[in-house]
Amino acid sequence: MWNRRKVLGSCLVLAASSGIARAQAPGMSGMGMPGMGQGPMTRESCIDICIKSHQMCLETARYCFEKGGDHVAPTHLALLLDCAEMCQMTANSLMRRSQQHGAICGACAQLCDACAKDCEAITGDDQMAHCASLCRDCARDCRGMVNMPI
């Protein structure tokens, strides 16, 4: 049975080796968004967009609480929070190279599309437009990861 130190040590080694591999990847810095003519779709780029989408949905939920009105509709807030959690779970599954990543990425893409559509329904608001755009990008990249080996 693994003790806590071995588990934590293994996680640190995995995180460090991932960082080293990312730093040594040729031509990866400043690549821009995948799927935008900036380079190939990678597991790392999907992790990055999922983390960004997670953060954006949480920030947008907070913004909606402060804004009030249509922004605080229970279904809208629930969708933002569901999307944030799904994006975080997807990033986590990709980081640990889960064999179930295809199913998780597919579900994330569907939820991000729904969140983007809901955010776009609140027109004339830059925060909502930015959230919708990032969710669409995340959905696109997650769809691209569904059948990719990791």
Region spans (language model):
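N-terminal secretory signal peptides and thylakoid transit peptides that target proteins
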Residues: 1-15
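Long terminal segments
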Residues: 2, 24, 120-150
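Short charge-dense sequence patches
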Residues: 4, 32-40, 56-66, 83-90
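C-terminal segment of N-terminal export signals and the immediately downstream linker at the start
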Residues: 21-58
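Intrinsic low-complexity, intrinsically disordered segments enriched in polar/basic residues
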Residues: 28-36, 83, 106-108, 145-148
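Extended, low-complexity, charged alpha-helical tracts
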Residues: 49, 61-65, 70-75, 79-112, ...
